[in-house]
Design a protein with these regions (language model features):
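Mid-domain Rossmann-like dinucleotide-binding core that forms the NAD(H)/NADP(H) cofactor-binding site
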Residues: 133-212
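NAD(P)H dinucleotide-binding glycine-rich loop of Rossmann-like/cofactor-binding domains
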Residues: 87-165
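Glycine-rich beta-strand-centered segment in the early N-terminal region that forms part
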Residues: 14-30, 44-91, 130-132
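N-terminal Rossmann-fold cofactor-binding loop
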Residues: 189-192, 227, 251, 277
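Rossmann-fold dehydrogenase core element
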Residues: 246, 260-300
Length: 334
């Protein structure tokens, strides 16, 4: 539990109350996300996080019990939960934009997440896992849904080229999911040799170290996806598309980060910049489907796992990023 910024405690708390329409899930695995580190550091806008906070919006587990009104899940079912606990009633939810729910509530930010051993979630955000999908892979469904929604908004056609700027977890998932669109080529751009090696392993046709500032295929790519969350990354992303190309910004959001790009670069080259945040419940379901069908494999993206009590080591690894660091998992015992 993060009591307040920079202060973490291990504490026994009462078992969360499982309401009639809720599911009580025993968390087995939780992914360490850059956003979790921002919550610990107090860098996230207070509109989106409530302290004390039990993080963990990327996680998977097993049903412990269900509320009286839940008929289609049972104890022992393997499940994964969407982070956004959307209301299903507001204007945005009725339009299918569940990620923009007017009653913002999110596991791991405003209610207890998968770093805790027991999590309560509304039935509508709980998905039973198909037999073929492992609990490890299920942890990555949340960030994969963020990526897939961004790709769908960019509308890549078969035979087009896709550039991926940044090859952390989001970038690795973008390389993986981009193959679903039958691209002519996927080019991954990064600044660390180890991460570029992982991108190649995941199916990138070409990788480019851009630490020196130069990048191949400038002005040549059909679709570019920015995943790095750094100002230089979005600046590079605006140089890569062809005239009429599309740019999806997935990682750049955050306090103090600004988009400062010459207007002519957009206007005179007819570029489209797409901001994409989160995922809808419909996109989440599609990620589960492609995993179950064996069309994608997330297992190579998981590179490290720690017992939950060693979360500090996991956070340190994510921050220092020595060697190949993909998704880092925390594992609950028992």
């Amino acid at each position: 539990m993060i009591e307040r910024p920079h202060e973490v405690v291990f504490r026994e708390v009462e078992t969360p109350v499982c309401g009639p329409g809720d599911v009580l899930v025993r968390s087995k695995l939780a992914g360490v996300c850059r956003t979790d580190i921002e919550v610990l550091a107090g860098e996230l806008d207070r509109r989106w996080v409530r302290y004390p906070c039990i993080p963990g919006h990327e996680w998977s587990g097993v049903v412990e019990s269900v509320g009286a009104d839940v008929r289609d899940l049972a104890a022992g079912d393997r499940v994964v939960c969407e982070g956004f606990c959307y209301c299903g009633k507001c204007r945005r939810c009725r339009a299918g934009d569940t990620h923009l729910c007017e009653e913002y509530d999110q596991l791991g930010f405003t209610r207890g997440g998968g770093y805790g051993e027991l999590v309560v979630a509304p039935r509508r955000v709980v998905h039973r896992l198909p037999e073929r999908v492992s609990l490890d892979a299920a942890v990555l469904i949340e960030p994969a849904s963020v990526v897939l929604r961004g790709l769908l908004r960019a509308r890549p056609a078969a035979g087009e080229s896709i550039g991926v700027v940044g090859v952390g977890t989001l970038g690795a998932l973008t390389v993986t999911l981009a193959r679903l669109f039958s691209p002519a080529t996927v080019v991954a751009y990064g600044v660390r040799r180890e991460e570029l090696e992982l991108a190649r392993l995941l199916g990138a046709d070409e990788t480019a170290d851009v630490s020196g500032g130069k990048a191949p295929h400038e002005g040549d790519l059909d679709v570019v996806v920015e995943t790095a969350g750094a100002v230089p990354a979005i600046e590079l992303a605006t140089r890569l598309p062809r005239e009429g190309g599309r740019i999806v910004a997935l990682g750049i959001a955050g306090e103090g980060r600004e988009l400062c790009v010459p207007a002519d670069r957009f206007v005179l080259r007819d570029l489209e910049l797409i901001g994409s945040v989160g995922y809808t419940t419909a996109v989440w379901g599609r990620v589960v489907e492609v995993l179950a069908a064996g069309l994608v494999d997330f297992d190579p993206i998981v590179t490290h796992r720690f017992p939950a009590e060693r979360f500090e080591d996991a956070f340190r690894l994510m921050t220092e990023r020595e060697g190949i660091v993909g998704k880092v998992l925390l594992e609950h015992g028992g």
